[in-house]
């Protein structure tokens, strides 16, 4: 969540011991690093999201990366109705026009326009991530002396891409702070609501679930604006209003 990586080594050790495939959800972690390695280069498969609020976007959709040729071929089939034109996978070939459906698959292909947008965005990724890190440094420095604000912690051996910047508001009513910031036109949000709070999950056996740490965090968290085109002047305005609300009584 919000690109927080931990226990990677332990996960991969368990997978190796028990001959398991590691499928890594990196929807929030494009451009991040763990122990000097880019996220997406360590697991058997890694998924990324290109939703509009992510570090780069294709409008919607995402990508899966793998270095395993067998998994790659399965993924290519799965995204395209299980259809192939690869002669080595077909039972016969009647010509260059010929194809076969050899497995169950779906229409999970991006459009050409989305792909073109994604390729262009990917070239800008390093610049986007660098700017996000600058914004985080400015937030952290600005809030360092504010006892009512807990800034996000970056684990050792990690370099976050900072998809989100989530603070915890202490000794203040989170909803009042949130509403006051929204009233000032600042696009704050809350990421996320514990899943078992939703009616669907409560109706399917999770009504009595309690995760005290998640519940405690949920009552305090607010996500502040972070995106590459956020100017220093705009960020200073956010910082000023957040500090005013968290230092003084509302």
Predicted regions and their residues:
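PLP-dependent aminotransferase class I/II
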Residues: 6-17, 33, 69-250
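Hydrophobic "anchor" residues on beta-strands that sit immediately upstream
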Residues: 20-21
């Amino acid at each position: 969540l919000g690109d927080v990586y931990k226990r990677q080594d332990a996960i991969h050790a368990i997978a190796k011991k028990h001959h398991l495939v590691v499928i890594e959800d990196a929807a929030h972690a494009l451009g991040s690093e763990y122990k000097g390695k880019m996220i997406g280069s360590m697991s058997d498969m890694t998924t990324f999201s290109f939703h509009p609020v992510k570090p780069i976007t294709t409008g919607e959709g995402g990508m899966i990366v793998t270095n395993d040729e067998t998994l790659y071929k399965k993924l290519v089939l799965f995204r395209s109705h299980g259809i192939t034109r690869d002669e080595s996978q077909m039972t016969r070939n009647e010509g260059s026009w010929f194809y076969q459906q050899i497995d169950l698959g779906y229409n999970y292909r991006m459009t050409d326009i989305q792909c073109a947008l994604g390729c262009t965005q990917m070239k800008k990724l390093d610049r986007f991530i660098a700017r996000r890190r600058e914004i985080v440094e400015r937030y952290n420095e600005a809030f360092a002396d504010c006892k009512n604000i807990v800034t996000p912690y970056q684990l050792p051996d990690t370099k976050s891409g900072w998809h989100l910047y989530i603070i915890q508001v202490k000794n203040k009513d989170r909803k009042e702070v949130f509403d006051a910031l929204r009233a000032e036109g600042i696009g704050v949000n809350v990421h996320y609501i514990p899943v078992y709070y939703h009616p669907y999950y409560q109706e399917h056996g999770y009504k009595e679930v309690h995760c005290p740490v998640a519940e405690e965090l949920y009552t305090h968290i607010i996500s502040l604006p972070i995106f590459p085109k956020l100017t220093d002047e705009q960020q200073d305005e956010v910082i000023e209003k957040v500090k005013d609300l968290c230092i003084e009584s509302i």
